[in-house]
Every structure is written in structure tokens, then in C-alpha cells.
Amino acid sequence: QQPVLRAEQLHHGDAIGVVDTDPASKSYGRLIGQTDFPQGDNELHHFGWNACSSHLCPYAPHAHTERRYLVVPGTHSSRIHVLDTKANPRQPELIKVIEGSEVHAKTGYAAPHTVHCGPDGIYMNALGTPDGGGPGGIFMLDHQTFELKGRWEKARGPQHLSYDFFWHLGQDTMITSEWGTPTRSGSSRTCSSSARPRPPRRSPAWRSP
């Protein structure tokens, strides 16, 4: 099996590839489209959709929101890329880039890691702060404009490390997990080979503000 995206074929180093998933197609399992990114130092990570059941469900009915945009964070650059998949699903269009400096300024966080659509916005966790330390946490983007809305937490408590997260909407509860700060997880330009994430020991539980 050859990789569908070869490093030598990427003009800038980062790209999103589209693979044919129709078993009846002659190109099944092969790369059929590609969108190159302007920069190549992002370390693209767990991307997600702008809308999902959490936004369309009875708790938060937004029937006219289209599930068409991919929101793609970069743990190294702290950039956030937004791609429109509707016009040409084989070659999504890059319609917005939020620079890492804007993420730092408006949220106080760095190294965005995972995206989940929520009832009142797009939730994104970050591993830490712009200086490579902590605490990490969660910030939000607008579903329609993708403008940064700031931090989600109102009262952090002892939580310091951040990784992934999900919720029980009916109970207004979120569970987060731990990993490491940008310096210790390799998501910072100042990371050293001797820095390693500490083993996670807790899964903080939150009451939605």
C-alpha cells in the first residue's frame, strides 16, 4: 500500500486529501482530490465539522445550519483552517485561515488539538498557552462566521492539562481528559527531546456554564 499523500508531492508541506470510499468505483481507496494549504508548519490534527447532532438536536434546534465546513486545527502553528466541502467535495475550498497569533490573543491558548460541534458553537480544545506551558483548555468559535468567541471555562479549578473532551448534553456535563502542555507534547517550537508528557491521572468533569 502506497501512501495517498506523498511528502514530495506537496508544494507547501500540508494538505487535505480526499479518498474514494465507494467500493464499486474504479478509484476506490485512492486519492481523488487534494487541497494544499498556504503554509507547511501546522501539524494538522483532529479536525471536525461545523455542525452535527449536538447543534441540530432538540436541545439546540438549528435546522438551517449546513454540515459542510471542515474546521482543521494545527497544534504546531496554532492556526485554524476552514474548508468548504459543498461546491466540490473532491477538492474542498480553503475559505478562512485564523492565524495562531489571533488564537493566542483572543483565547490565551495555543496548540489547538480537537474539534467538536456543540449546541451553541464550535468547541475546540487547546493543549496549553502561547509560552508552551499551561493550563490548556477549551475555546469556542461561531458556527456561521467562524469568529473566535473566547474561552469556554468560567471557573477552572485545579485543571491544568488538556487533551480531548465530550459531553452529556442532557446533564449539562462535560468530561475532559489530560495529556501534556505544548512543550511536553511536542506541539511547541521550543520542545526538547527530553520533554515528555506526564501520564494522565485525572479526567475532570465540568458543569456547563
Regions found by a protein language model. Give the residues of each.
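Short, conserved, GDST-rich strand-edge loop motifs in beta-rich repeat architectures
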Residues: Q1-L10, C57-R68, V72-P73, N125-P135, ...
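Structural signature of eukaryotic scaffold interfaces centered on beta-propeller domains
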Residues: E43-E66, G108-P119, F165-D172
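Beta-propeller domains
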Residues: A155-S162, F166-P209
